[in-house]
């Protein structure tokens, strides 16, 4: 039961609300430069002619011209048509509100005695503005409670705007009702083939088919596609990432080519480990070559097609070829690495037992690598990795089943054998009471650490990117808002840091450099080159003899001369007939100990020169 006291309080509340609403309607100043003029017409993007309440009377002033308003509307229409929801784009209220907010209806008043005229704009009601921003789900992008920048008064009044018209002999407290249009389904909704920069318009009738061709649409009902490279970074930052990929591809390619040439062509005593290394290094070389092919084709930007509208897919020869090469030899390289780990452990564990499984594992590795590489090709699933710079297997399902899971298993098995190798070395050295265990094991430790840790990072980053795809590409609206307010080239979508993607690229392309450091920078490689035809030919001998003659001349007749060659060191004292000392190299042509095991890359030291190798003769 409502008492008289309740009625009294209710009446007071109504009075308070009414008083609040009246006092919230602030008085707007009259701009003396304001005037009414006809609508200048639609642009390519903005179609307001059918949505304005009065196209013959649009408010303009020195601070707000129709051209300025049309530029702003072009941006908002572009955003609306590009990423607006279906219900937002299909409602006439959206366009009526948007057009009338920036092309305000104009009312003019004239003093008949002085013929002075003033013009004032009719603003959109705040409730209408809130309804539209909620309908279009852009409350975070547009605040209906904001103030106008010039007079710092509400852009959208609650009910009406108050003006002082005493200047033209009118009401000093004139109330101009705000504009609140009603949705009208009979009004034709505009259709345009325009997309705001940097989005690109594609005339698509089948989004699913076009997505298979490499396009990525900003929404299911828009023909605007995301540009490539994806604006995760600025163009300058993308260029730095491209340079990193190109440089590492070349370095890895050159490094592995050096190893193949040194240990399989120049090397006069090739052993089983050289042959095994050649299979592994050859696979890494081909992995790196895929990046070099892209470089010579124009760099990673050559994988971007149609002016940045789409990425390369299996139909593009460069993409399918480099993707197939990278997948094929990545699988082969890791399988050869596992076999190398096993054979190294077996030789150290069972020194007297011979093992020859090449006729089994080489065909097996070739078959597995081909199968895992042909499946993506047959299912049309090679494409450029969006937000990256090479082509590879598409879809998470295929990546996991054909690469990540097999690779993880193989890496783990290889790591176990490397661990056993380190254990055996430690056991043997400890049994002989010799120090320097860490020095002996350092290359094995680096081998497992570098390869395994880079794999872990690649694995984690790949899954992170797959999980972030919806988040990254769901920020087109905020990205576009940035382009409205700033230089578009400096606007980016919030995604993985440039450092994390840069390290991902580093891990993919660095394996050839790893191989060169671990295998190519040692005494054995130096000695192979030293004894090769490049340093043992007439031209080099001529240069060496001339240098020695110069050195001999510089010492004078009473001096001491020392001559060093690849095999013999001779020291001669010319006075008093002192004995001369000849030291034959432990690696001379006829040295019986110079066998295959001396060149075993997994031996930790060469045979030492003993006293029996030293001959003392009379000069």
UniProtKB/Swiss-Prot annotation:
One of its GO terms (molecular function) is transmembrane signaling receptor activity. Glycans are attached at residues 4, 63, 112, 143, 159, 184, 203. Disulfide bonds join 36-106, 48-99. Residues 25-245, 300-321, 380-402, 466-497 are extracellular. SUPFAM superfamilies: Family A G protein-coupled receptor-like. One of its GO terms (cellular component) is membrane. It is a multi-pass membrane protein. Residues 1-24 form the signal peptide. Keywords: Disulfide bond, Glycoprotein, Membrane, Receptor, Signal, Transmembrane, Transmembrane helix. Its main location: membrane. Residues 581-605 are annotated as: Disordered. PROSITE patterns: FZ, G_PROTEIN_RECEP_F2_4. It is found in: Membrane. It comes from the Eukaryota. This is Frizzled and smoothened-like protein L. It comes from Dictyostelium discoideum (Social amoeba).
